[in-house]
């Protein structure tokens, strides 16, 4: 299911973000890059996955008639 896969990717990216915030060596620009990637992935999950129209959660997809 694409929505579950992208939700897992989102959780993974933000887990990486939390780890980069805790490490002093990775703080700063690295954590901001990871946060920006996570923000883009959330937009993909929110809008992009419904355009696929496949999977168990395809009730919100757009139909092409």
From Swiss-Prot:
InterPro entries according to UniProt: Cyt_c_assembly, Cyt_c_biogenesis_CcsA/CcmC
Keywords in alphabetical order: Chloroplast, Cytochrome c-type biogenesis, Membrane, Plastid, Thylakoid, Transmembrane, Transmembrane helix
GO CC entries: chloroplast thylakoid membrane; plasma membrane
Keyword Membrane found: yes
GO molecular function term, any single one: heme binding
TM helices/strands, residue ranges: 5-19, 33-53
Gene Ontology BP term (one): cytochrome complex assembly
Topology relative to the membrane: Multi-pass membrane protein
Location of the protein in the cell: Plastid, Chloroplast thylakoid membrane
Domain of life (superkingdom): Eukaryota
Family matches, as PANTHER family: CYTOCHROME B_B6 PROTEIN-RELATED, HEME EXPORTER PROTEIN C
Family: Belongs to the CcmF/CycK/Ccl1/NrfE/CcsA family.
Known role: Required during biogenesis of c-type cytochromes (cytochrome c6 and cytochrome f) at the step of heme attachment.
Subunit structure: May interact with Ccs1.
Protein name: Cytochrome c biogenesis protein CcsA
Protein species of origin: Pisum sativum (Garden pea)
């Amino acid at each position: 299911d694409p929505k579950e896969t992208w939700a897992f990717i989102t959780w993974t990216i933000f887990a990486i973000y939390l780890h980069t915030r805790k490490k002093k060596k990775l703080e700063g620009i690295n954590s901001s890059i990871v946060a920006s990637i996570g923000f883009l992935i959330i937009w993909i999950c929110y809008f992009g996955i419904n355009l696929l129209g496949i999977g168990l959660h395809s009730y919100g997809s757009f139909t092409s008639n």
